[in-house]
Amino acid sequence: MQRITYLGPEGTFSEAAMITLRTTGRIPGSSEVEPVSVASAREALVQVQAGDADYACVPIESSLEGPVVPTLDTLAVGAPLQIFAETVLPVSFTIAVRPGTAAGDVKTVAGFPIAAAQVREWLATNLPDAELVAANSNAAAAEDVKAERADAGVCTEWAAQRLGLHALASGVVDEAHAHTRFVLVGRPGPPPAATGADRTSVVLGLGNVPGALAAAMNEFAIRDIDLTRIESRPTRTGLGTYRFFLDCVGHIDDIAVGEALKGLHRRCEDVRYLGSWPRGTTAPTGANPPVLDEASGWLAETREGRLR
């Protein structure tokens, strides 16, 4: 049985993402899973690094708020980790209250910071005088309401139902079509086979020399590889020192992507490969890398003196 950590407690979007990955057969190995709820995305990943869990299911990107910083920072340091799968979930929230609570009774609202940011306008319009208090997760916000530590909570519908809370409002989100991307992370191993609709991710450490970032980007540009995400995060070793997170369309087994990764290894102080895996959405996301088999064949013939 495989042990999978996720940002808990029960009733979070992370749990829903883990269930989606399990029911769609995207968790490598045994289909028998032991879900383990933990208090943070960082803890979920650290347990995998320590060998106390086989995989972690954690959020990595919000369409409204961008990168999930604790996930990025933990992926970049410590024992190597690798992403094996992803899923994208539509996101909306329930504003949960204890039975009998009206909007006028709400003085405090518990919310996971990423979730609270996605309903900021709704709260300002409908609960303008309420104080926002931080919760460890969406489900923890519901538990804060149940325990009377807050009058209302920004949570998932199923977290509210599980605790017998009522919905002051349902389907709340400031922007329509909000989504969050979740990834399944394990210790390094062979990546899933290429599907033709894949994503590859790396973390780069660059030297403090002119043009270092441009040179790294050029490894993708000269091969017509589409970059879909570029993020920078401080290394925490001093001011002005950053590492860069890059996602591109394609798979390490694609010739163009493989050549780009070799180029990065030559140019960069450090390259941490985070994996190649099938994209979690069927919507087109960038252009696939070019097929270089013909070019490779031409080069082989030229080396043999068979000029065309």
Curated annotation (Swiss-Prot):
The residues that cross the membrane are none
| Pathway assigned in UniProt | Amino-acid biosynthesis; L-phenylalanine biosynthesis; phenylpyruvate from prephenate: step 1/1
Site feature location: Essential for activity: T180
Instruction: List GO BP terms, alphabetically.
Output: L-phenylalanine biosynthetic process
Residue span(s) of domain Prephenate dehydratase: 3-187
Cellular component terms per the entry's GO annotation: cytoplasm
The Swiss-Prot or TrEMBL record annotates one GO molecular function as:
prephenate dehydratase activity
Say if the entry is tagged with keyword Amino-acid biosynthesis: yes
Residues forming the ACT domain are: 201-278
Task: Tell me the keywords, alphabetical order.
Answer: Amino-acid biosynthesis, Aromatic amino acid biosynthesis, Lyase, Phenylalanine biosynthesis
EC numbers, comma separated: 4.2.1.51
Reactions catalysed according to its record: prephenate + H(+) = 3-phenylpyruvate + CO2 + H2O
Do you know which InterPro entries this protein is assigned to? ACT-like_dom_sf (IPR045865), ACT_dom (IPR002912), Chor_mutase/pphenate_deHydtase (IPR008242), Preph_deHydtase (IPR001086), Preph_deHydtase_CS (IPR018528)
What is said about its interaction partners and assembly?
Homodimer.
What PANTHER family does the database record attribute to this sequence?
PREPHENATE DEHYDRATASE P PROTEIN (PTHR21022), PREPHENATE DEHYDRATASE-RELATED (PTHR21022:SF19)
Name the NCBIfam families for this protein.
PRK11898.1
**What is the protein named?**
Prephenate dehydratase
- Organism field: Mycobacteroides abscessus (strain ATCC 19977 / DSM 44196 / CCUG 20993 / CIP 104536 / JCM 13569 / NCTC 13031 / TMC 1543 / L948) (Mycobacterium abscessus)
Please name the gene that encodes this protein: pheA
